[in-house]
Amino acid sequence: MPEEGRPCPWVRWSGTAFQRQWPWLLLVVFITVFCCWFHCSGLLSKQQQRLLEHPEPHTAELQLNLTVPRKDPTLRWGAGPALGRSFTHGPELEEGHLRIHQDGLYRLHIQVTLANCSSPGSTLQHRATLAVGICSPAAHGISLLRGRFGQDCTVALQRLTYLVHGDVLCTNLTLPLLPSRNADETFFGVQWICP
């Protein structure tokens, strides 16, 4: 005798039907787990690779290196224990100029105090200029910072700018003015902020 009413909306699995389907179900679960593992391990290795590429931020804090009389407007910088609190991590010094090895956004800062400076100043001091720029490669040559001393004995400048691998930063001070050798009065630095 047939049953009356609505038939059941779902299929009832018999034990033998489940036994036939479970290997396929197990295969789907295995493939899903494998894909998730492969995807996540790829992401982790990329993050680990980034950490290895940038174990610490690229930064440099430099002191003036006046070992010979100035014959051109270029200021030469140095770093290391012999020059006090100066260092380079990432960028390197090349003939007193700073070479960048990592593309990214950098914070540049410089302060130069004139040696034997008097507050009223001379006409030359009023016109004196401190400039920081990219001097190499020549195709990228550009002035990044520029400031006049005017009536002051000190100029301090800073800015954020994008620099690329191979950029060489140069600093110029109007001749024949001499910068102070005091590390608290004359210094130059860069700090890598982000890619």
Swiss-Prot record:
Keywords: Cell membrane, Disulfide bond, Glycoprotein, Membrane, Signal-anchor, Transmembrane, Transmembrane helix. Its main location: membrane. It holds the Pfam family TNF. One of its GO terms (cellular component) is plasma membrane. InterPro entries: CD70, TNF_dom, Tumour_necrosis_fac-like_dom. SMART domains: TNF (SM00207). N-glycosylated. Residues 58-193 form the THD domain. Residues 45-195 are extracellular. Very low level of expression. Detected in splenocytes and thymocytes. The chain crosses the membrane at residues 24-44. One of its GO terms (molecular function) is receptor ligand activity. Induction: By IL-2 and concanavalin A (Con A). Gene3D superfamilies: 2.60.120.40. Belongs to the tumor necrosis factor family. This is CD70 antigen.
